[in-house]
Amino acid sequence: MLNDIKNNAQTRMAKSIDALKHTLTSIRTGRATPALLDRVTVNAYGNASTPLNQVASISNADAHSLLVTPFDKSMIKEIEKGLYNAEFTPNTLGTAIRINMPPPTEERRKELAKQVQKEGEGAKIAIRNIRQDANKEIAKLDKDKAISEDEKKRGEDDIQKLTDANIKDVDKVVADKEKELLSV
């Protein structure tokens, strides 16, 4: 019973960290990565919210630019429109689109670092809520006399250790992203 609660908490905490990592990949650092275009949607064949990566291949042209190559060449105008809507400035090169990523200003990098910290804090709150849920489940087992007082204490200690380890992981992910942001 306690192992199930602990495993469930670990799985949910790991998902919170994965969600944080995914969110942080979409924050522009000045380095061009295809993940920056994950949230770009285009109007493809009547569907207004088709993800860009389903209608084009996205690759790195160099460290500061991406190359978007549509699978269907007639989609270039719609892809350009989707990129403009997502606040990118595409340059059409015949059958492909190049997107230059200028490095952010010092002020913008500091804003982005604050955003990274905010996202990290959100992940920590999610992890603490998972801890709270697990502790409630343990308390319910204790109340129902399904476990002893010692098992309850041990279970709560294990959940706390799990929480501390996952919060440390969040701190590392946030610190790595901030370092990447603030280095020019």
UniProtKB/Swiss-Prot annotation:
Gene Ontology CC entries for this record: cytosol
Q: What does this protein do?
A: Responsible for the release of ribosomes from messenger RNA at the termination of protein biosynthesis. May increase the efficiency of translation by recycling ribosomes from one round of translation to another.
Identify the gene encoding this protein. frr
Question: Quick one: where is this thing mainly located?
Answer: cytoplasm
According to the UniProt entry, where is the signal peptide? Answer: none
**What Gene3D superfamilies does UniProt report for this protein, alphabetically?**
3.30.1360.40, Ribosome-recycling factor
Q: Which Pfam families match?
A: RRF (PF01765)
Q: Member of which family?
A: Belongs to the RRF family.
Which organism is the protein's source?
Stenotrophomonas maltophilia (strain R551-3)
Entries under SUPFAM superfamilies matching the protein:
Ribosome recycling factor, RRF (SSF55194)
Location(s), subcellular: Cytoplasm
Q: What keywords does the record list, in alphabetical order?
A: Cytoplasm, Protein biosynthesis
> What is the name attached to this protein's record?
Ribosome-recycling factor
Q: Name one GO biological process term.
A: cytoplasmic translational termination
The Swiss-Prot or TrEMBL record annotates one GO molecular function as: ribosomal large subunit binding
User: What InterPro entries does the record tag this protein with?
Assistant: Ribosome_recyc_fac, Ribosome_recyc_fac_dom, RRF_sf
Is the keyword Ribonucleoprotein assigned to this protein? no
